């Protein structure tokens, strides 16, 4: 029987003392695999910064999630482009300015709520009525996109909350959306794309909270398909005013 070629564990002496401590003992090895010894005492990162370091399964999950997310974005972008093209054609072909979807008297009353407004022309409420109609239609379309992503057939108020948090021009509506609706079903998915692997949590867009249980690079399943990771909206004011954990325990 040949002697083992593995080095025997060394005995180290700590400077300034007489007590002897055994050095790190290598893990048991098999003939076909080398021993794995930690390179240093510093803790390894929670996830690799280089995608090449991921396992084949994680790479496949990330690629599927990224592909699904890109296809979903392209489909939704086409829907929005078609929506605005139809609205422009509708505006250009409008000849009836007497019948409107929204009551002009109610719109005029809202406009007069501003004390600085003294006189309102006859065509101003007409423009506001059309603008409000388009606003409702677009917000409904964006909300319905979130409904379909979650494999549902009924538009709910948390879908509207998702549409608001996803769209920059709807930021002025964030404060009127209940926080319970923002937290439901991963509301607030960013539209810029999937975050790159290895990016720390503090580099995500301001105002988005990454759930701790969500593994970076892993996708959320939507009806058997791999989807994009979810993000939850966190109120910036609450982020600043939230006391440290030590103070809360007191």
From Swiss-Prot:
SUPFAM superfamilies given in the database record: Histone-fold
Location in or out of the cell: Nucleus; Cytoplasm
Biased composition (Acidic residues): 238-250
Region feature (Disordered): 219-250
Function, as annotated: Probable transcription factor involved in the regulation of flowering time under long day (LD) conditions. Functions as a repressor of flowering, independently of HD1 and GHD7. Controls flowering time by negatively regulating the expression of EHD1 and HD3A. Component of the NF-Y/HAP transcription factor complex.
Complex formation: Heterotrimeric transcription factor composed of three components, NF-YA, NF-YB and NF-YC. NF-YB and NF-YC must interact and dimerize for NF-YA association and DNA binding. Interacts with NFYB2. Interacts with NFYB8, NFYB10 and HD5/NFYB11.
Name this polypeptide is given: Nuclear transcription factor Y subunit C-4
